[in-house]
Amino acid sequence: EAQPYLEAIRQLRNELGPRNSLTSHLTLVPYLRAAGELKTKPTQHSVKELLAHGLQPDTIICRSERSLDADIRRKISLFCNVDQEAVIQMLDAETIYEVPLLLRDEGIGELVVDRLFTEQEQDRFATTPDLDAWIDFLKRLKNPTVTIPIALVGKYVEHQDAYKSITESFILAGVPDEVQ
């Protein structure tokens, strides 16, 4: 199913050149409670699949419920042929709106700037982005002061994601006024 997309990415990357593109691979690094460890094999296999389609990721973003220690990062780096600092941890987040802050904390911005811009161009990115408004948005989202019950009538209401766009729009509409 994904083959046409992978081929399009491969062709685009060849046309743009390595200094004008960056490929990030998002992968799950599951924690197996029975073994008490994070498993990197699924990540290694998915990168090998990408390689079979002619794509070598520049960064690997590792979703996980547990932190990646230095040994896990080293292992992923070694077996997936990426720099160790390009192995980015993405811990499970309470809300998707936390993801930009988690990525910032992992240094992905600096990694992207280093990869795509010359040293002279990098000066434009020397200042830290002001994320105060985003942090305020998150605070309001996670700590509503008022709750308003809303009934949703539909055919598939028992399926949690059936009306996801509607429920998400209600949530977002309430954020400025700290309403849930």
Features from the language model and the residues they span:
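N-terminal beta1-alpha1 cap of cysteine-dependent amidohydrolase-like domains
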Residues: 1-180
